[in-house]
Structures are given as structure tokens and as C-alpha cells.
């Protein structure tokens, strides 16, 4: 057993966990943050994507000890109260989801993509960057449309700050 301390969605967290505990299981089983989904446990599907220190990471392949001291953000931590994050709003407005299982991971990956590419983001880049996120329901068209729409919203919001 090890004690880990990290910040999750802006709150300090300390947990005693087995050394083999994956971050996704700490989030879901110990902290009840069930928006982060377990799809494959092999880093293939992207349903478990969270941000560690601002970068998208598949939490099913990160040991909790590797995140010790880190700042972790989950899908539950990106909205501001009842106000959706621009990426969440764009997915809603552009019908970027169907069953919703992949959506939290898609949104977390997409936020990271927009943060890295800014106004240089185009459709080909979005499609390439989302290759690690699998959706079984959609043809990805509305997901890509959502990401590009959100990129505009996020860039406008950042410029206003």
C-alpha cells in the first residue's frame, strides 16, 4: 500500500491504494467520479481520457503512483457550475454524441487538441489526433464538427480573458 496525494478537479485528495491501482480505478472506485469510463483497459479506446497537468492521458494505463503530486482534471471538473465548457456545449449543439459512452474521453482529448493547436486546427488534424478515441455509434462527422466549433468558441473565450 502507498499513500498518494494529488489534486483532482481542484480539490486535494489523499488515498491509500495498492501500488498496482490504476488512476481510472482511483477516480471511479475511490472518488466516485464515474464520468471517466473504462472501455478496454488496454489504452485502445480512449474512453478513460483525463488531463494530468493539462495534457490528455489515458487513465487506464497510468498507475496512481505515477500521478502522485499531479493535477488531474476529469470530465466532472471542466464545467463551471451549470455552465458547460465550450467543448461540452459544442458536442451538445452539433450532436457530437449518440450513446455517450465515448463522449467524456472524446471531450477531454478534444480540449487538449484545441489547447495545443489553437487557431491552426483543421479537420484533418482533428481526425488524426482523435485516432486514439473510438466511437462505435457515429461516423465521427459530428464529433469533428463539434471539435472545430468548440475550437472557435475556446479561442474567442481565451482572447477575451
Where are these regions (language model features)?
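Signature of N-terminal electron-transfer/Fe-S-associated modules in redox systems
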Residues: 1-161
Amino acid at each position: 500500500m502507498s499513500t498518494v496525494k494529488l489534486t483532482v478537479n481542484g480539490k486535494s485528495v489523499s488515498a491509500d491504494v495498492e501500488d498496482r491501482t490504476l488512476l481510472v480505478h482511483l477516480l471511479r472506485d475511490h472518488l466516485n467520479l464515474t464520468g471517466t469510463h473504462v472501455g478496454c483497459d488496454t489504452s485502445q479506446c480512449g474512453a478513460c481520457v483525463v488531463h494530468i497537468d493539462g495534457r490528455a492521458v489515458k487513465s487506464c494505463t497510468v498507475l496512481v503512483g505515477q500521478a502522485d503530486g499531479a493535477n488531474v482534471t476529469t470530465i466532472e471538473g471542466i464545467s463551471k457550475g451549470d455552465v458547460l465548457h465550450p467543448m461540452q456545449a459544442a458536442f451538445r449543439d452539433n450532436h457530437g454524441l449518440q450513446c455517450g459512452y465515448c463522449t467524456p474521453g472524446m471531450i477531454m482529448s478534444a480540449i487538449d487538441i484545441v489547447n495545443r493547436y489553437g487557431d491552426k486546427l483543421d479537420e484533418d488534424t482533428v481526425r488524426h489526433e482523435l485516432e486514439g478515441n473510438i466511437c462505435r455509434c457515429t461516423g465521427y462527422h459530428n464529433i469533428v464538427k463539434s471539435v472545430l466549433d468548440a475550437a472557435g468558441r475556446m479561442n474567442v473565450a481565451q482572447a477575451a480573458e
